[in-house]
């Protein structure tokens, strides 16, 4: 069922991803990401490497649903997606607070995707797509790359990478995510 669903939605959402988003994409696997990373490492003096803390367990269902609904309009497909999300892994309480939260917000929000499902991998790329666009626009699509939840930005300026980390943290906070 997950493969059939991905066959329907992947062509719709994949075209919205930046070119430097790797993993779980046709023609954009580990080797392509490593080649891109290596080329950038040889060209630039500094690299910001960032990792999203507990990425799959932290994906917020309400935010993910909103992202999915921007691209998928078929009620039957959305119903299937909702069923998959509702029946996904049990949630572990995580006391991460974000601007606007009340005391119970971290416990009231359903989170998490099972790592092995094909739908989870596609949705993980979609979840970070807006952050990818913001980072690629600010730092150039050729100096930014992401492989699942591992993010790299390259520059000849350490100060620019400090700015990149701040911008990335701000974008991730909008998704209720933290950096390691």
Task: Go through each PLM region and give its residues.
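Active-site beta-loop-alpha junctions of metal-dependent nucleic acid enzymes
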Residues: 25-30
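"…together with the soluble PPM/PP2C metallo-phosphatase catalytic core" -> "…together
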Residues: 2
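Conserved polymerase palm-domain catalytic core
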Residues: 19-20, 34, 39-148, 152-179
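Charged boundary/loop elements
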Residues: 11, 15-20
